[in-house]
Amino acid sequence: DNCLILANFVEFDTLFGHRRDAEGYARALEWFDAQIGPILAQSRPDDLVIFTADHGNDPTWRGTDHTREQVPVLVHGQNLAQTQASDRMIAFQDVAATVAAHLGVVAQGQGGNFL
């Protein structure tokens, strides 16, 4: 029953972030925000849903380089204890270790399960 679905919404980055298209970026975020509820409504009790990004791009900033190194990590699971906010820094290796633990796989490397 355990599986992994990875979806990369590259359009935020390639079509709007690097192009500095603030209006397009806003529309894409609004569209994505409207999809979160239906996605979570279809999740099963043992599912773990993680939303994050590899970097940020402020579409109002000049140039085409990445403008944000810190990005949010949003986690949903019906079996998680509670909703909480944290300023804790979570690295990609931690996301990988958390997914591995959820799937029952021994993680390799230095990451830690953040749940």
Locate the predicted segments by residue.
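Feature captures the catalytic ectodomains and active-site-proximal regions of enzymes
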Residues: 1-115
